A protein has these predicted regions:
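Catalytic phosphate/metal-binding cores of nucleic-acid and nucleotide-processing enzymes, i.e., regions
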Residues: 1-139
Length: 139
């Protein structure tokens, strides 16, 4: 987890930063909004296999409702998201890596639902998108 933690340490102090934009929208409406601004939606979307949502959360009720993996903190959830993207053989993680390889999202807006006052997995995704070749060489 050394690489994952070092990536987390490079993330901005707030959620709204870089290419991450805040817009309170959810599910397929979020996907539609992100497409309308030429970007990507970063949250989980029900009934979609391919999305950029984080399978980890520090919110117990959300984990129980959406079958997520519980972490102690938001920071832990973000680090675990980085780990998931870099190392998991889950089909969605493999798909995310293929999107990163394509570079189609470099410099594009990434829609997240709220300012957390700390980095979110959307910030981690932004970092991975825009530094993928360097990161990939270290995995």
């Amino acid at each position: 987890m050394k690489l994952e933690t070092s990536i987390y340490d490079k993330l901005p102090a707030t959620t709204k930063s870089g290419n991450v934009v805040i817009h309170k929208v959810y599910q397929r409406k979020g996907v539609e909004y992100a497409r309308s601004i030429g970007g990507a939606f970063t949250l989980r979307v029900r009934d979609m296999d391919k999305h950029f949502g984080n399978p980890y959360s520090h919110v117990r009720a959300l984990c129980e409702k959406d079958n997520l993996i519980l972490t102690a903190t938001t920071k832990d959830a973000v680090i675990m998201f980085i780990h998931y993207v870099l190392r998991s053989m889950d089909s969605r993680a493999v798909w995310i890596r293929s999107v990163l390889d394509s570079k189609v999202l470099v410099g594009k807006p990434l829609v997240y639902y709220s300012e957390l006052g700390e980095p979110s997995h959307a910030n981690a995704l932004d970092y991975l998108i825009n530094n993928w070749d360097e990161v990939k060489s270290k995995v």
